[in-house]
Amino acid sequence: MVNLYAATKQAYRSILRYYIETANLKVINLELFDTYGPNDQRGKLFALLDRLRTSGDTLAMSPGDQQLDPVYIDDVSEAFIAAFKRLRSDVVQDEETYSVRSQNPIKLKDLVKTYEDATSSTLNIEWGGRPYRAREVMVPWSRGETLPGWSSTVTLQEGIKRILDSDV
């Protein structure tokens, strides 16, 4: 099966490489991990947890041992600003690639527990009610270099609090 998302990322890198070589373009690639924040319309994990909390529905999930590395949107924005400043400083020779991650991976089960603690709720989750997906990533890739001058500062607990505060 062809993964079109991966194919478009590879095509982007090839086109970018062409312009780096022919137009002396300077580039910083930021590889984003799981991002989250208030008003996220993508239907990602935190929106799902919030829906479960307010509806009381039960959700069958995997056993929950896969790890996630969520990065709050404000930290992602700061990474883009740091990358821009690095490009402006003329230290980038051609292309640099950095990982934008919290550096604090957490198991899905533990993330849900953190969410429950932050919301003073208990979600109706049937852990192990469905199998892991084919090719489930159990541990996020962690060998990418961190952008100089940047680190994630918003903890998971603080990020969840900010999401909840934005709903008021």
What are these regions (language model features)?
Residues 1-8, 36:
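Catalytic loop of short-chain dehydrogenase/reductase
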Residues 3, 40, 44, 68-74, ...:
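Residue-level signal for the nucleotide or nucleotide-sugar donor/cofactor binding architecture
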Residues 10, 14-68, 73-77, 81-84, ...:
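NAD(P)-dependent short-chain dehydrogenase/reductase
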Residues 34-35, 58-61, 68, 80, ...:
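A recurrent short beta-strand within the Rossmann-like NAD(P)-dependent oxidoreductase core
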Residues 94-98, 109-112, 120-141:
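C-terminal "lid/loop" region of Rossmann-like NAD(P)-dependent oxidoreductases
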Residues 144-145:
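Hydrophobic/aromatic residues within transmembrane alpha-helices
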Residues 155-168:
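Amphipathic terminal alpha-helices
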